[in-house]
Design a protein with these regions (language model features):
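Jelly-roll (double-stranded beta-helix
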Residues: 39-367
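Generic extreme N-terminus detector
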Residues: 5-7, 67-68
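Short linear motifs in low-complexity or flexible loops
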Residues: 5, 15-17, 21-25, 30-34, ...
Length: 367
């Protein structure tokens, strides 16, 4: 059994990412109930009824003036406690030579805009013969977003997709009415010592798009431009910020930004109806408030929020439209509880399609 398969077994015993968690629209006042969850098995999203076609990403490495910083210079930033409404600590599972930190869903906060699932995996160093080994499993009514800093994962799905993902790429898998996928490693990767470090997030789909045809989209890193904003390299992975629009497909207003800051560098953050800042590495300061490594700051809607790096840091900013009520159980998310029950019955009865090239194994529905 590979390491990622172990993650599923162990996280099912943890009081996070409830398998049957009801997520109300006013989720700030109704924390998720404790329950069982598993890696790559929980999430949510909602948005506009019309699907947006993204614009083409601008070219690489152009220095741009930060419009958020311009606003701050005119009227001053929002800082400290006024900017941070909640500070989340990760639920960490140690798997020996691998760890996973889960930030969403959490008891204090279930969703940020359309984002409902946020896992930070690694960094992990694997010896030969160990690594990523997630057997085929299903999803409905959501989209998975995988982004790596180091390493490689091999994606297969029931549509016939076969796609390695490497650092800088985005893999967007739209489950829609139902998809099955696995995440493993190419034999040549698994045969040698290797490292893995990255983020896996989930979005739920707008009610009007929950039952769309499943799809898989791969965006090479070269198609996602790096911009230098106030001296810091910034990548707009999804949505629009800093005058840049990502080519990655969205179904609702969605924001996903990665940035790297050197010690002492400052960055004004873009606006969004809801937003949260995750410290992948390093330490940040927001006014007089310290944001430690692996913490997630739920930010206010104030337009001007500026962070400063106490040490060399990497950050991920997520946000977007707040969502309506969603249910979540195992790998299934839906606005309708009965739809999840149907998905469970279909998986139990073997009615989902198989993954070509990975037909021999599957993850059973948890008891």
């Amino acid at each position: 059994m590979g390491v990622f398969a172990e993650i599923g077994q162990r996280l099912r015993q943890q009081p996070l990412a409830r398998c049957f968690t009801r997520i109300p629209a006013d989720h700030d006042r109704f924390p998720a109930r404790a329950g069982r969850g598993s890696y790559d098995e929980c999430s949510t999203d909602f948005g506009r009824k019309a699907e947006r076609e993204p614009a083409t990403a601008p070219e690489e490495d152009t220095t741009m003036q930060n419009p958020e910083r311009q606003a701050e210079q005119e009227s001053g930033p929002t800082q400290g406690e006024d900017a941070v409404t909640q500070l989340l600590k990760p639920h960490e599972t140690d798997l020996g030579d691998f760890s996973v930190r889960r930030l969403l869903p959490a008891a204090k906060r279930t969703m940020v805009g359309p984002w409902i699932f946020f896992d930070h995996m690694g960094p992990a160093d694997f010896p030969p013969g160990k690594g990523v080994n997630v057997r085929p499993h299903p999803h409905i009514n959501l989209a998975t977003v995988t982004y790596l800093f180091e390493g490689e994962i091999l994606h297969r799905d029931s549509l016939g997709s076969l796609q390695p993902i490497v650092p800088g790429d985005i893999n967007l898998m739209v489950a829609g009415r139902g998809i099955v996928h696995s995440e493993r490693e190419r034999p040549e990767v698994a045969a040698a010592p290797h490292r893995l470090h990255g983020l896996q997030l989930w979005l739920a789909l707008p009610e009007a798009d929950e039952e769309v045809e499943p799809a898989f989209h791969h965006y090479p890193g070269a198609d996602i431009a790096t911009r230098t904003i106030d001296g810091a390299p910034v990548r707009v992975l999804m949505g629009s910020a800093y005058g840049v629009t990502s080519p990655v497909k969205t179904f609702a207003e969605t924001l996903y930004v990665e940035a790297q800051l050197k010690t002492g560098q400052r960055l004004a953050l873009p606006e969004s109806p809801e937003r949260a800042l995750y410290v992948v590495s390093g330490t940040l300061r927001l006014g007089g408030m310290t944001l430690p490594e692996h913490s997630m700051a739920i930010l206010s809607q104030a337009a001007r929020v500026i962070v400063e790096a106490d040490t060399d840091s990497r950050i991920a900013l997520i946000g977007g439209e707040p969502l309506g009520e969603r249910f979540i159980e195992w790998n299934f998310v839906s606005s309708r509880k009965e739809r999840i029950e149907q998905a469970k019955a279909d998986w139990r009865a073997g009615r989902y399609p198989v993954v070509p090239g990975d037909e021999e194994e599957f993850i059973p529905l948890p008891d």
